[in-house]
């Protein structure tokens, strides 16, 4: 009779052992990694498998700072690397170091290449596939095409001044030459001796205010 309770106890112990889930390796998918970037953004990195046997892994990075929160996602097949298959922890730690050196974790590293799997090929690396920071303006962005510049206006003014100068030169070239009026020959005036005589006559016979007129008339009629 004692055999039956012992058999039941052994059976229950075996069932309890089978019901326990296997312990996950440290650094495998499902674990969270907390870190801080060079710009002091607080971030969390979460790797997750797409399914058993798929071999494809998604890596989610969520960050926040005093001004904003942002995120990005990476995709790859690190299981193709033998070092990752043996122990995934060094792979994720090296990916974490790459993100930690950035000012913003989702900008500046489109591909994560952990050194333990660098020779395994591009499929074993983590490629960034989406980010909330995509399309954000860069610091040294060029001015928009609609922004007017001052140089074309100066060029237009210079061109207009040049054209006005050309038009003025053409008008001067077409202008008719001006002819100077020919001087008419002057008639010979009365002789000096006649003038003196006319003045003398006018002084003798004319009233003082009209002496000049009288002298002129006397000289004119005497020729």
UniProtKB/Swiss-Prot annotation:
Pfam families: FGF-BP1. Residues 175-186 have a biased composition (Low complexity). It comes from the Eukaryota. Its main location: secreted. It is found in: Secreted, Extracellular space. Expressed in serum, peripheral leukocytes and cytotoxic T-lymphocytes, but not in granulocytes and monocytes (at protein level). One of its GO terms (molecular function) is growth factor binding. It comes from Homo sapiens. This is Fibroblast growth factor-binding protein 2. PANTHER family: FGF BINDING PROTEIN-RELATED, FIBROBLAST GROWTH FACTOR-BINDING PROTEIN 2. Residues 1-19 form the signal peptide.
């Amino acid at each position: 009779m004692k055999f039956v309770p012992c058999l039941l106890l052994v059976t229950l112990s075996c069932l309890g052992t089978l019901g326990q889930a296997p312990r996950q390796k440290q650094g495998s998918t499902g674990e969270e990694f907390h870190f801080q970037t060079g710009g002091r953004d607080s971030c969390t990195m979460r790797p997750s498998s797409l399914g058993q046997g798929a071999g494809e892994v998604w890596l989610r990075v969520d960050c926040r700072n005093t001004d904003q929160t942002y995120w990005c996602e990476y995709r790859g097949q690190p299981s193709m690397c033998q070092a990752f298959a043996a122990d995934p922890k060094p792979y994720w730690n090296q990916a974490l170091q790459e993100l930690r050196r950035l000012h913003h974790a989702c900008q500046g590293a489109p591909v994560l290449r952990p050194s333990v799997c660098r020779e395994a090929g591009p499929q074993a690396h983590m490629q960034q596939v989406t980010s909330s920071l995509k399309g954000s303006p860069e610091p040294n962005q060029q001015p928009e095409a609609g922004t007017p510049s001052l140089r074309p206006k100066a060029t237009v003014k210079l061109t207009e001044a040049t054209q006005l100068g050309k038009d003025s030169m053409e008008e001067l070239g077409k202008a008719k030459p001006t002819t100077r009026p020919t001087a008419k020959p002057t008639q010979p005036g009365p002789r000096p001796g006649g003038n003196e005589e006319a003045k003398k006559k006018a002084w003798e016979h004319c009233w003082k205010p009209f002496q000049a007129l009288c002298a002129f008339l006397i000289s004119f009629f005497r020729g």
